[in-house]
Amino acid sequence: MFNQQVYSNRRAKLREKMGSGIILVPGNSESPMNYTENTYHYRQDSTFLYLFGLDMPGLFGLIDANTGKDTIYGDDITIEDIIWMGTKPSIRDLAASVGVESVAPFKAIFSKVDQAKGQGAAIHYITPYRAETKLLLHELLGIRPSEVSANGSLQLIKHLVDMRSVKELIEIAEIEEACETGYQMHVTAMKMAKPGIMEQEIAGTIQGIALAHGGGTSFPTILTQNGQTLHNHDHSFKLEKGRMIIVDAGAESNRHYASDFTRTIPVGGKFSQQQLDIYNIVLKANNTATSLVKPGETYLSIHLKVAEVIASGLKDLGLMKGDVKEAVANGAHALFFPHGLGHMMGLDVHDMENYGQIYVGYDDEIRPVKQFGTGYLRLGRRLQPNFVITNEPGIYFIPALIEKWQGEKINNKFINFDNVNKYLGFGGIRLEDDLLVTESGARILGNRIPINPEEVESFSEH
């Protein structure tokens, strides 16, 4: 965890923004895989980490904006716990380490909430994403589980988005630590991408690198020859010479800040000319996005400019036709680029996505676009210094989507389907960097993973 003053300052700032009421911050409990004692890898709730910093199950935080008092609710371990799990600091000592003086047994949260309800105090919480947290809030608040989701505090969400979007220097350092691990994961994958090796062997190796650095992976690894599937978690295929693999993988730092990178690697060390033609369009799109990022720009506008770069490159190859700006305005590029350019990143790989992307990636000025493709853009709002974002353009040839568009004559005016059909077995290419928005532009976080085709080929050959 960080210095206790970091968490005290964050809670004080949140209390000031909220003005009044109590804020409920439940930590995550253990999640069983197949019986109670056999659990999934534990991951603390990111809001709890941000405000209270303690990385263990069985805790509940409360911030009282009326009195200025913060409390951590939890139970000290028993002798049975010590026998099986070893000794641990007391709840009081843990709380003191993050600047909290008040502690109480876990069950005492019920009487505290009852007292607040009796006094007519506003009770704020983030809409839960775990069923057990929803049931706990249902019991605490005395409302139906369906009402728990409906009654999440929009005021709390907006204030936390404001705070967490602008990264502190200590947070940026954590993200760069995760980026360094991510670098090692990706260059290892490049070196292992040989014909005959199984995808799962590479995936297992790079996930091991993340675990060896202490934090583990920041999301399930995507590593596949079938890159036409955007989030392909199947690692069951043997690598074939002449094909490409997409590796979309990242790590968490020990304090749970994320990295998220994607590279596309030629199996056997050499891109074909067809692959290189598409790769260079995606690389140009990636570099264009980085050059356009600066405070005051909307990420929606950058996404659309990148879409024009992709459409223009595909037009040069004879895959698209017509006016490029008109094609993008009509969403024709989304046949090949059917997702958004990027998202916020921090304590979550898709930072604060549990708050609702409408509040994290958009605001009253910039609203989501409903058009296919651009509608998947998770971040459209104006950029500010110390935002951390991803930049991940891609081009994919998805047989089912191509068949649908051709059959229904969707954007026929802008697509040369006869030429596109020659790419049906191509797969896909995605290139992703993590960016820090600076006062005047953008900085790629961490050592940039090899991305120019000759660099990638060099790593893959050796």
Predicted regions and their residues:
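Active-site neighborhoods and metal-handling regions in enzymes and metal-associated proteins
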Residues: M1-H462
